[in-house]
């Protein structure tokens, strides 16, 4: 049975939800792992969905945060320049096209420059509101980014539907009191309110009084 949500706005994660940047992430973070004597698989298991400095703090708990921020800045520059293999996830172009003129925001752990580069490389339009890493004080799973996105669109958190593929992103939506749709096969393990195998399984219909009907499945 399809899941149906009636909301006023959508809050969208980027990497893994709209954009497939997995090849770049694997290249950059595998180099990080080798630099620090870590197993690449162990690093890649925790990197997804959060800001780089937060991942480094988890992997290198004894290292000063200043060093994490410095290395993260270098890696962000590397990732922004490396767009080889960055493509839209299935259904993303049509999904975003269906949102034209409707309230929606991008809420990503990527920097503004990285987000714009990956969206452009994927030929995807930028949402009217973007909440990027520079605009929050805490990375997902903290709900700050989603709460900021809801506020900037002018809606209460419970009136917004989140789309996420990562465990920390689903947790952030939950912490913010927002319903959440998991996107992609691995999202099922994180307990979203509904699961879309791809964005091809999602339809958004604008109704009266600014209400959006979102059907998943």
Predicted feature residues:
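A generic structural signal for short
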Residues: 17-18, 84, 104, 134-135, ...
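Hydrophobic residues in well-ordered beta-strands that form the structural core
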Residues: 20, 106-108, 182
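Residue-level marker of regulatory loop/turn positions in helix-turn-helix DNA-binding domains and
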Residues: 88, 107, 138
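N-terminal helical cap/lid subdomain that shapes the substrate entry/recognition surface
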Residues: 3-94, 100, 111-113, 124
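Asp-based, Mg2+/Mn2+-dependent phosphohydrolase catalytic module
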Residues: 1-8, 111-217
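N-terminal-biased segments
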Residues: 103-107, 121
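Glycine-centered short loops/turns at secondary-structure junctions
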Residues: 101-103, 177
